[in-house]
Amino acid sequence: MKNKEKLRPFDEPLFCAIGKHRPEIMEDFTRVLLNDDSIKFKDSAVNIIPASITPDNKQTAEFIAYTKNDTVICFITDSQNEEEMINKVKWYRASRIKEYAGEDLDSIQSMILVILMEKDAFGYERPFYVMDSKLEYSDKTVIFRYKQIYVNSEYGFDDPLGDYIHDFMCDDIDDMRIDSIKEAVKYFESIGE
């Protein structure tokens, strides 16, 4: 992130930079999102995949963390409408999940795919939407079940989740609500990342 560029997750992903340098912030965001204080990331079990282009020429970015109970939590961004979003998630799911688990999906206890949405794609004004999903392999009898959580970045309430969503979307350090994110962004700017 350069000083003159806006710190928005759909341009240069702030949550990826935070995940790389300050994974404890993303760990706390995950606890707030899932309402589960027991969430703990494994040490050095964080993977940042730089912004990439999907088959429909849209940019996405990824942050992957592994919890101590072997849950994989993947964060991606999306600024598209619902239909394009669903198509991208299908592409992402097919191209990435097997890569994390190798040939053995049993090595993953569970998986949560968190999609940070620029708009409220479903239109119900909720902070997030949870869907149960599954991945089936036609050549095997394997069915891998996981959760998809669509986070509504237009959610503007003054609660812990709203504070995180606000700061991930914010391009003004002085307007950020969470001190640890402010400090992280100031650090990123000081090193020119």
PLM feature spans:
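Elongated, amphipathic alpha-helical interaction scaffolds
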Residues: M1-E193
